[in-house]
Amino acid sequence: MAFGRNNRVRFRDWISEGTEYGYGRNKARPSLNTVLKNVRRGLKKPLSFGSHNKKRDSNSSTTTQKNIINPQGSFLQNWNKIFLFASVIALAIDPLFFYIPIVDGERHCLNLHRNLEIAASVLRTFIDAFYIIHIVFQFRTAYISPSSRVFGRGELVDDPKAIAIKYLSSYFIIDLLSILPLPQLVVLAVIPNVNKPVSLITKDYLITVIFTQYIPRILRIYPLYTEVTRTSGIVTETAWAGAAWNLSLYMLASHVFGALWYLISVEREDRCWREACEKIPEVCNFRFLYCDGNSSVRNDFLTTSCPFINPDDITNSTVFNFGIFTDALKSGIVESDDFWKKFFYCFWWGLRNLSALGQNLNTSKFVGEIIFAVSICISGLVLFALLIGNMQKYLESTTVREEEMRVRKRDAEQWMSHRMLPDDLRKRIRRYEQYKWQETRGVEEENLLRNLPKDLRRDIKRHFCLDLLKKVPLFEIMDEQLLDAVCDKLKPVLYTENSYAIREGDPVEEMLFVMRGKLMSATTNGGRTGFFNAVYLKPSDFCGEDLLTWALDPQSSSHFPISTRTVQALTEVEAFALAADDLKLVASQFRRLHSKQLQHTFRFYSVQWRTWGASFIQAAWRRHCRRKLARSLTEEEDRFRNAITKRERNAASSSSLVATLYASRFASNALRNLRTNNLPLLPPKPSEPDFSLRNP
């Protein structure tokens, strides 16, 4: 395979690095320092390339080729999946900042949730670490040259400078905007160092900062999802995981709209307070609306200036209309310090209105509120359609085989009814279809293997059949090359209980190797009366060896040999079949093994040779018994004759003479019958397999 050395790039496997990250089953989640340390360690490992790359000087080639990652390798594919899930989690963490502003119900002012500030900032920083690692990988990931995609997988570009230029001109700006720690800066750095009311700055800045990064993060997910599905074909391994993945995206949108609904509810109450404060400027200051200000009169007018009235119940146009945010204010969810209570209530509101496409939303005349309701309606329509379509696709993939089985059974029933088959044949057909479904689950193994490369198909067949073939003594003494040739030609077959694999007198078209089940091989020696021989075949046994003798004979005719035995399945049987044409192709290789050992092995384990040998021994034993009986009868006859002669000389009584005559006649008749009876016919001697080196 020397041609593979000049036109391929060879990368070292990154599986060991994957295990170092600790994503194994029994390992705890690694810390950020551990992840970064393992990433640096993995990037320092050398990777070997083929000789087709551009020539560089000795110093540059040793430094630049060490840190390049194969874009089609298993390490990067696994990392892209991890980063995809991390990106989705990041989209779920950013809306948590919207829950930081709260309304102090006792003092009627805006305040901040300090514990939530810290928790959201820590979670956001942890997720940003994945973005940092991803950016580092992007600067060290080779790419396929677009001009080389005419044929095959294309040529990998491993030049670090070219890789950096390509990444800087594509997604680097989006990744940079996504990784900027703007929410953390606003919460932990900007707010403590300003003179304006803290809650006012937080409320105004959070929406701007979050959406500045939220849009780039959403834009980055789609090409990442496309890359994962393009390289590995799927995101999740099972259909249920795929359905859960699509459902999680729908729930993520519900979480985002619920958090926005909460923040805008706080903003609308703040707007109502501002309008009420503008009406009495002599006693009210905007700083009174925030809990870091000082005033003793704010509770007097804020309690009655902004009543929470449903939009349908408003009769006075001067009353502030909270629209779709009335529920959040009346329920007191904006005044609660319990984060989980707020989170689940707002999440339920978002999920309910997304599912209802916003049909129950009664908005006010506020333009921002109307736009928010329209976005809920459109997003719900799009997401619900995608959710139903994708979940239907994933869930149908789990039942597609069952549906195909039902259709096949229905077609079979209609066909059997149309052809008016008898009940026994119908039962056999149903039993075979049921057994085939239980064994294969509707997977067409032959079609699946046929579409695989030859070497991979050979290895799979070796995995299936090699151990079984080695249990057959005939194949145990063969070399690996011959076993590979036999394995490649084997095809799986199924037999139901009481079905016939081979019938006596029919042409033998295949040789069977039993993998599971029990069969009976019987012969009547061509239907001769009184002859019956049966043996039982168990796993690792074989039958149809007439075909092997026929295939090994260079002078054999084109007609298949006639079977001398009937093979019937006593239980459900799984076996591998070697067809006559395939066996003929392999037979030329068998003739190289012209050893006596192979010939004796074939004779010893062949059912036909065993039957013939047993019959031959029985016939020899019968001949021995007949000869022994003939000798004894001859001796008895001679003894009787001597007795007759002796009695005649002694003039014995007539009665004794008559008895002696009768005994003599009986011995003579028995001997005559013994000589006239023929031995039972022997089964025909099986043909000798030709293991010579003659060419056919």
Swiss-Prot record:
Entry's SMART domains? cNMP
This protein's name = Putative cyclic nucleotide-gated ion channel 13
* Entry's family note: Belongs to the cyclic nucleotide-gated cation channel (TC 1.A.1.5) family.
Q: Give TM regions.
A: 82-102, 117-137, 171-191, 205-225, 244-264, 368-388
- Membrane topology (UniProt): Multi-pass membrane protein
What PROSITE patterns does the record point to? Answer: CNMP_BINDING_3 (PS50042)
**GO CC annotation:** plasma membrane
Keyword Transmembrane tagged:
yes
GO MF: calmodulin binding; cAMP binding; cGMP binding; monoatomic ion channel activity
Q: Where in the numbering of this chain does the IQ domain appear?
A: 610-639
Q: Where is this region: Calmodulin-binding?
A: 590-605
Location of the region described as Disordered in the Swiss-Prot/TrEMBL record: 45-65, 677-696
Subunit annotation: Homotetramer or heterotetramer.
| Entry binding sites for a nucleoside 3',5'-cyclic phosphate | 474-598
Which InterPro entries does the entry mention? Answer: cNMP-bd_dom, cNMP-bd_dom_sf, Ion_trans_dom, RmlC-like_jellyroll
Q: What does this protein do?
A: Putative cyclic nucleotide-gated ion channel.
Q: Which UniProt keywords apply?
A: Calmodulin-binding, cAMP, cAMP-binding, Cell membrane, cGMP, cGMP-binding, Ion channel, Ion transport, Ligand-gated ion channel, Membrane, Nucleotide-binding, Transmembrane, Transmembrane helix, Transport
Q: Which cellular compartments is it found in?
A: Cell membrane
Originating gene: CNGC13
Q: Which residues lie on this side of the membrane: Extracellular?
A: 103-116, 192-204, 265-367
Which ranges sit in the Cytoplasmic compartment?
A: 1-81, 138-170, 226-243, 389-696
Q: Present the record's domain note.
A: The binding of calmodulin to the C-terminus might interfere with cyclic nucleotide binding and thus channel activation.
